[in-house]
């Protein structure tokens, strides 16, 4: 699930409801809008029924996206 909320894009795992990526504050304060969420959905589709070992074309960009996000716990900030 992807959400745009208070200057951050949240990429939530539906089982754990954990994980998010924060946009740079300056970009958010200037009012510059990032690319629409639909762009990210099309570029990195949720691979619900896809084995990443069988589909290397989609697995590599998805792995890069997930590993580049900071690991934080925003519930207690």
From Swiss-Prot:
Pfam families: Ycf15. It is found in: Plastid, Chloroplast. It comes from the Eukaryota. InterPro entries: Uncharacterised_Ycf15. Keywords: Chloroplast, Plastid. GO terms for cellular component: chloroplast. Belongs to the ycf15 family. This is Putative uncharacterized protein ycf15. The lineage of its organism: Eukaryota, Viridiplantae, Streptophyta, Embryophyta, Tracheophyta. The gene is ycf15-A.
């Amino acid at each position: 699930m992807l959400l745009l909320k208070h200057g951050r894009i949240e990429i939530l795992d539906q089982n754990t409801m954990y994980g998010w990526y924060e946009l740079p504050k300056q970009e958010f304060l200037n009012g510059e809008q990032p690319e629409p969420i639909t762009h990210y959905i099309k570029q990195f589709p949720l691979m619900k029924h896809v084995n990443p070992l069988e589909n290397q074309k989609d697995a590599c960009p998805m792995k890069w996206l997930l590993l580049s996000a900071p690991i934080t716990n925003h519930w207690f900030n």
